């Protein structure tokens, strides 16, 4: 299977404690995911930290993968916790991918998670999450937990291998 991995490129999105940036940590997580997927014989393509969202989506579409997986950590008020996985709309391959990943991720997270959600109107009517809307391949965008919550940031840092394995299994 051909898989496009797209870790966050948000270099200014800082987490709590020792977390550092979302870009650094999600690229670190994606490094682990990539190694695991290659062990299963999958062909992996991936964005680079210097790419914009539009460039990453264009690169994904150029490689024509079977699936596109965006890997992020979330931010809110500093109090929220839990994983959430987005697909563009319910009813298609993107939803199946998102649910498969979520079902495995939910097994390793220490809190009540936030489920699988549609992203077609994420930023308002007709304003979707870019990576779920404009990739040609079925796409899922994962938010593994909240990096602006001290416990969430710590959990991500201490459980990279478990999180990666859950994503790969999904």
Positions of PLM-derived features:
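Surface-exposed patches in mature extracellular/periplasmic domains of secreted proteins
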Residues: 43-50, 111-119
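N-terminal catalytic cores of peptidoglycan-degrading enzymes
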Residues: 53-59, 63, 67-70, 77-88, ...
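Active-site histidine-acidic residue metal-binding/catalytic motifs
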Residues: 1-57, 63
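A short, glycine/acidic-enriched catalytic loop
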Residues: 12-21, 75-104, 108
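Long, well-ordered alpha-helical scaffolding segments within enzyme catalytic domains
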Residues: 28-38, 95-110, 152-170
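Active-site-adjacent mobile loop/cap segments within catalytic or ligand-binding domains
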Residues: 4-6, 11-13, 63, 68-77, ...
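Loop/turn elements at helix/coil->beta-strand transitions in domains of secreted/extracellular proteins
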Residues: 1-2, 37-43, 63-68, 108-112, ...
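Short glycine-/small-residue-rich flexible loop motifs, especially phosphate/cofactor-binding loops
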Residues: 34, 57, 102, 129, ...
């Amino acid at each position: 299977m051909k898989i496009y991995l797209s870790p966050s490129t948000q270099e200014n999105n800082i987490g709590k404690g020792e977390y550092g940036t979302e870009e650094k940590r999600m690229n670190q997580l994606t490094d682990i995911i990539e190694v695991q997927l290659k062990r299963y014989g999958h062909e992996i393509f991936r964005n680079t930290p210097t790419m914009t969202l539009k460039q990453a989506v264009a690169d994904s579409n150029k490689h024509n993968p079977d699936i596109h997986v965006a890997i992020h950590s979330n931010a809110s008020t500093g109090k929220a916790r839990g994983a959430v996985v987005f697909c563009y709309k319910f009813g298609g391959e993107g939803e199946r991918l998102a649910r498969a990943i979520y079902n495995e991720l939910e097994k390793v997270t220490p809190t009540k998670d936030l489920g699988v959600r549609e992203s077609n109107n994420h930023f308002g009517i007709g304003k979707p999450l870019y990576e779920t809307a404009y990739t040609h391949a079925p796409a899922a965008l994962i938010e593994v937990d909240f990096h602006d919550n001290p416990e969430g940031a710590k959990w991500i840092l201490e459980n990279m291998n478990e999180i990666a394995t859950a994503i790969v299994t999904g």
